[in-house]
Amino acid sequence: MEIRSMELGGRTGHEAGRLLLSQMYWEKTGSPMPPVLVQERGKPYFGEGSVHFSITHTKRRVLCVLAEKPVGIDAEEMDRQIDLRLAEKILSPGERRQYEAAPDKRLALLRFWVLKEALAKCSGEGLRGYPRQTELSLDDPRIKILDGCLVAVVREK
């Protein structure tokens, strides 16, 4: 699994994401990137081969991950402000207890958010209706800091 990040550099998140994905695909396979297709629920994928990917972008950066199995990535800038009322909508009861005990509620909610988004991207199901059904931990090792972003990467086992 390989994760890479780059500044948007005046490009849209979509443009920068496709550029980074194309570069990473070329470096991994030595071949031009095949067409990107989209599943029914919106998950992009390559129609051929065994390379899986996920892309996310923030205001300043785009991040991409390549893997041999389905994968999802999400990122938020460390300084991003977030409406704390979102906690009521996305956190399970156990997560809510962790959130309430956290010294920095904004950062705790961002940690849960990026992890839930990465899980949703990996599964291809999106966040439609189930974010509170998943019980996660604030200390989940899949959450990292990369280039000033809080990043979560989830891959199928």
What residue spans do the PLM features occupy?
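Core catalytic alpha/beta fold that binds nucleotide/phospho-ligands
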Residues: 1-157
